[in-house]
């Protein structure tokens, strides 16, 4: 089992927090992977998996998660002050860039956005000739985690587009509305040579994956990470 200290945190959205931890030594992982945080309850070890939210940075790793009412791990993490410690295992996971990296559409809802922060911050400076589009769905505007950061990246990298969409917009919202699925097909058009990464809840993923296959996209071009 590994240990890590909380060194910083901030509110990423209502009831959603970004955590920065520092381990005892270097943490080697690929952007898109996750770690498992461990807690003990009634003599049993309970684990929860959380995607890493930043590229490799020595001994540090970032997580972003919702507070879950009645949960076990998330209330403990939200109670931590800087200097507090966690036990963790990993990294794990295969939700990473396919090689060679192709033009890609990245799709997320909720905290499914987390691995893309790690993946894009690492990859955009390295792939000026590849085009990346991030389609991110939330219910409300305040739920668009990392919105300002992705808008900044879109302004700095001409090969990156950020397309947020809301399912329950307020009257002040002038952007896209509706589920992510419809906007994915707007971006995809007639192309079938792009990789489509999908991260979020199982129902959204299954629906979109089935629709993509019906449209003729090879199943090997669809890479998924389910959060439930």
Model-derived segments and spans:
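Ferredoxin-reductase
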Residues: 2-82, 139-140, 167-168
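Histidine-anchored nucleotide/phosphate-binding helix
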Residues: 113-125
């Amino acid at each position: 089992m590994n240990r890590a200290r909380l060194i910083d945190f901030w509110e990423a959205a209502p009831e959603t927090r970004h955590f920065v931890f520092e381990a005892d030594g270097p943490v080697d992982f690929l952007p898109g992977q996750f770690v498992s945080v461990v807690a003990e309850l009634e003599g049993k070890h309970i684990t929860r998996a959380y995607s890493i939210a930043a590229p490799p940075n020595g001994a540090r790793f970032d997580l972003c998660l919702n507070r879950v009412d009645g949960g076990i791990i998330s209330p403990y993490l939200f109670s931590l002050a800087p200097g507090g410690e966690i036990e963790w295992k990993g990294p794990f996971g295969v939700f990473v860039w396919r090689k060679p990296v192709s033009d890609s559409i990245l799709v997320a809802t909720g905290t499914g956005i987390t691995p893309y922060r790690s993946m894009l911050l690492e990859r955009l400076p390295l792939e000026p000739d590849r085009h990346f589009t991030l389609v991110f769905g939330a219910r409300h505007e305040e739920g668009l985690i990392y919105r300002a950061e992705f808008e900044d990246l879109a302004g700095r990298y001409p090969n990156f587009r950020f397309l947020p969409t809301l399912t329950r917009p307020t009257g002040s919202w002038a952007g896209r509305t509706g589920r992510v699925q419809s906007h994915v097909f707007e971006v995809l058009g007639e192309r079938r040579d792009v990789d489509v990464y999908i991260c979020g809840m199982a129902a959204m993923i299954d629906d979109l994956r089935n629709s993509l296959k019906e449209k003729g996209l090879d199943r090997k071009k669809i890479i998924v990470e389910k959060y439930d």
